[in-house]
Amino acid sequence: MKYKDFTAEDWSYIVFTDEVSVKKSDDVTDFWVFRRLREREKCFPEQVKPKTRNSVSLMLWGCFAGCFKGPLIPLHDTETAEVYIQVLQEHLVSFILETLPENGVFDAIFQQDNAPTHKAHITQHYLEQQEFVVMQFPPNSPDMNPIEHLWAVLKKELYRRFPDTSDLPGGRGAVQRALAERLAIVWEDIGPDTMNTLIDSMPRRVQALIDAKGWYTKY
């Protein structure tokens, strides 16, 4: 495996990127119910979490490298390959230049998953044209991207700090704008220690991936 000998410091020069969908309603928390044996067939309304349908959501793109976060970009429209390329042009390049100036845009290693918009021909052509060094990402292990854990922190903090998020008034556009504003506040407050912890875990993640022969791991 190409990156098996990377240290945490080596991993700090990888630009991890991803998209995330955040819903108006908090459906990210797991609830456990413990019942006595004689009550296992009974249904208690207070123990049932209703499923929210047609909840307004907002898609966002973000990135980080080392202990530095990039911008959190709302994608109000459906993400196409063209939209994705525009995001890279307008936000990724400037982030790399500001964060990794000694490497430069064309020496930084860029990570993306295998989403269709990322693997589209025009996206691949753009990356080749711009001479980006793209990390080969294992197809069966999305859990290898530490930004997934950053998304979990983002969502958890959103609903903790803004518990009325599920009651945001207005139509789809108004709710998406309110979500974007709140998420920007939460994103800004995620400190460097969080990213450092994720980067420090990368050698262990890689070893776990090797042990799992490329399949899913505990991460």
How would you name each of these model-derived features?
Residues 85-109:
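Short, basic/hydrophobic alpha-helical segments
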Residues 1-90:
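Extended, low-complexity cationic-aromatic segments
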Residues 17-19, 101-118, 141-145:
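Acidic/histidine-rich, metal-coordinating catalytic segments
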Residues 120-130:
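Short, aromatic/basic amphipathic alpha-helical patches
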Residues 10-14, 21, 147-219:
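C-terminal anion-handling pockets and recognition modules
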Residues 42-48, 111-114, 128-149, 163-165:
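RNase H-like polynucleotidyl transferase catalytic core
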Residues 26-30, 122-123, 147-149:
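Short aromatic-enriched loop/helix-cap "lid" or pocket-rim segments at secondary-structure transitions
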